[in-house]
Amino acid sequence: MVGRDAGAGVRLSVNVNKVATLRNSRGGAVPGVVAAVDTCIAAGAPGITVHPRADQRHITPGDVRDIAARLAPLRDSVEFNIEGDPRADLIDLVLEVRPHQCTLVPVQPGEITSQAGWSADTSSERLVAVIRRLQLERIRVSLFVDPQEAPIRWAKHVGADRVELYTEPYARDFAAGGATRSAAFSAYAAAAELAHSLGMGINAGHDLDLDNLPLFRTLPHLDEVSIGHALISRALFTGLDRAVRDYLDVLI
């Protein structure tokens, strides 16, 4: 499978959830999530992602509002992406702050992080209504899916503008190397080609890092990657500014 032209840039959206996780582990306001957003933007990040979960384990509604206010003057240059399950309070918050993009993600009880994309047999009536409501407010809608034909076609059926390919399986198979690595990339490339042929954009995220990203960024038609855990972990040793720049060096 032929990859993307290495000269074409892919947007980086920095997920700042882990900054809020660290803050909440102690209480108080340190480290500041908005300060982290400022540092990411100063380093050149063209996107910021948050995933405000119902239990508020990291990002809170207040964080979302504060980040939205900080990014408002930069709307033409820095995209804001809010991830989450389509629960009523989250959709109301998204409609309030009007990010560029809302990535709808299925949530399993007790999960630490997202573990799978939407199933193609998910009841779609309510989801279709949510997607249309967001799009009427000019909010792009992306659906978190596995790199398989059925969920990608389902995403198109329910009206998504983009899909976000769940990349944990790619990261695992990349680490295995050899034919396993090649087969994994080919499967994701085929998924991207299908989504593109259906008129949807392609995002990706989960366990992407500086080791596996150079290959993955050549994925055909890839628009954006959302990276949080690996980037924030690297920042502990290099500083946040340097960590963001290291990822941008791979993507641009």
Where are these regions (language model features)?
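Histidine/lysine/aspartate-rich catalytic loop segments that bind and position anionic ligands
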Residues: 109, 140-194, 198
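Alpha-helix-loop-beta-strand connector modules within alpha/beta enzyme cores
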Residues: 57-88, 122-142, 180-204, 210, ...
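Hydrophobic faces of well-ordered beta-strands that scaffold small-molecule active sites
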Residues: 10-16, 48-50, 78-84, 102-104, ...
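Glycine-enriched alpha-helix->loop->beta-strand junction motifs that scaffold or abut catalytic
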Residues: 44-46, 71-73, 96-102, 136, ...
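C-terminal helical cap(s) of enzyme catalytic domains, especially alpha/beta-barrels
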Residues: 176-181, 234-252
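Conserved N-terminal beta1-alpha1 strand-loop-helix module at the mouth
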Residues: 1-85, 95-99, 154, 180-183
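Catalytic cores of alpha/beta
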Residues: 87-97, 148-158, 204, 208-222
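Glycine-rich phosphate-binding active-site loops on the catalytic face of alpha/beta enzymes
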Residues: 46, 103-111, 162-175, 221-240
